């Protein structure tokens, strides 16, 4: 009897876990969305020119002067850039 209860419980847990995995697969990958729809861009992702708040976190600032890439991309901020971004009051994370 204990074996049957344990087996039934295991099957229920397995069914719930597989359903949540399917849900995750159906969700849109945030990396595939344009920066404007994501709310903010990760490091080395396109960003909005002149808007450091378009880069996620306190570590990212928008850099439009990359020698090998056209356009603007988020980069790791230096100490002064981090301080300037903090005072801007960006609302993204």
From Swiss-Prot:
This is U12-lycotoxin-Ls1a. Expressed by the venom gland. GO terms for molecular function: toxin activity. It comes from the Eukaryota. It is found in: Secreted. Belongs to the neurotoxin 31 family. Its main location: secreted. Keywords: Disulfide bond, Secreted, Signal, Toxin. Residues 1-18 form the signal peptide. GO terms for cellular component: extracellular region. Contains 5 disulfide bonds. Residues 19-38 form a propeptide.
